[in-house]
UniProtKB/Swiss-Prot annotation:
NADPH binds at S85, K86, R252, G253. It comes from Pseudomonas putida (strain W619). It catalyses: 7-aminomethyl-7-carbaguanine + 2 NADP(+) = 7-cyano-7-deazaguanine + 2 NADPH + 3 H(+). HAMAP family: QueF_type2. The gene is queF. Substrate binds at I83, E84, S85, H223, E224. Catalyzes the NADPH-dependent reduction of 7-cyano-7-deazaguanine (preQ0) to 7-aminomethyl-7-deazaguanine (preQ1). Homodimer. The keyword Signal does not apply. Belongs to the GTP cyclohydrolase I family. QueF type 2 subfamily. This is NADPH-dependent 7-cyano-7-deazaguanine reductase. The active site is at C184, D191. Keywords: Cytoplasm, NADP, Oxidoreductase, Queuosine biosynthesis. One of its GO terms (molecular function) is preQ1 synthase activity.
């Protein structure tokens, strides 16, 4: 478990406060997990963003009438802190009986509080239900590897030694899988995800990638760190010209978390998958 997470509200019974309280947000420094991966804030080998989507966002108009919407939050991948997910939920619930005259006023409040917790500017979009409904759901790009016939029996820790490539052959391809699963390091609850790997480098053996991703199945870590581990393991193996790892997780507690890590500085669209 991350030592800071032990003091978070995650896994504990909590009072649900319905009036604005930004102090509910619980930041967790990224540095400890980065150290496990052998990187520091000064040597991060990726660009990226963590997209969070909130499906339980509500507040009051000055008339007392409630409004519901969907919140989209973009937290820079190099921010000093992640925000613990239950504290994020509790904070958002504290807006339920709080008055905001306009969406812009709410958005400014969210950006201020979340940026303070993350330690770097957080971008916020508050979208109407009609907007999100019109967007619909999308399919992941590239080739799905889930139908490959693989054998695996160890699910406790990620196993980068399972990965194989052909160092004599360079390819550019996009692969995806819906079989990513890990567990919350505090509660043990399952985190279900889909992941895209896009790269140009040594030709990756597709079956080895699938068994490697499945090896996360009982691993306990936060979403962001799982994606960073996948990124680094692939980077070390493939020596790629470019590499992107993008995971989209199923929501828990009204929030889904979608980490994106890439050699390039371009951020992807925040689009929903069928399980989201």
């Amino acid at each position: 478990m991350h030592p800071a997470a032990e003091h978070s509200p995650l896994g504990k019974s909590s009072e649900y406060i319905a009036t604005y309280m930004p102090s509910l947000l619980f930041p967790i420094p990224r540095t400890a997990k980065w150290a496990e991966l052998g990187v520091t804030a000064q040597t991060l080998p990726w660009h990226g963003v963590d997209y969070w989507n909130c499906f339980e966002l509500s507040w009051l108009l000055p008339s007392g009438k409630p409004v519901v919407a969907i919140g989209e939050f973009a937290i820079p991948a190099d921010s000093p802190n992640i925000i613990e997910s239950k504290s994020f939920k509790l904070y958002l619930n504290s807006l339920n009986q709080t008055v905001f005259a306009t969406i812009g006023e709410l958005q400014a409040c969210l950006e201020k509080d979340l940026s303070a917790a993350a330690g770097k500017p957080v971008s916020v979009q508050v979208r109407t239900l009609a907007e999100v409904e019109a967007q619909g759901v999308v399919a992941l790009p590239g080739q799905c590897i889930d139908a490959l016939d693989v054998t695996i029996s160890n699910y406790e820790q990620p196993q980068p030694e399972l990965l194989r490539c052909n160092p004599e052959r360079v390819v550019e391809e996009t692969l995806h899988s819906h079989l990513l699963k890990s567990n919350c390091p505090v509660t043990g609850q399952p985190d279900w995800g889909s992941v895209v790997v896009e790269y140009k480098g040594r030709a990756l053996d597709h079956a080895s990638l699938l068994t490697y991703l499945i090896s996360f199945r009982q691993h306990a870590d936060f979403h962001e760190q799982c994606v960073e581990r996948i990124y680094l393991d692939l980077k070390n193996l493939l020596q790629p010209e470019h590499l992107t790892v993008y995971a989209r997780y199923v929501r828990r507690g009204g929030l889904d978390i979608n980490p994106y890590r890439s050699t390039g500085a371009i951020s992807p669209e925040n689009v929903r998958l069928v399980r989201q």
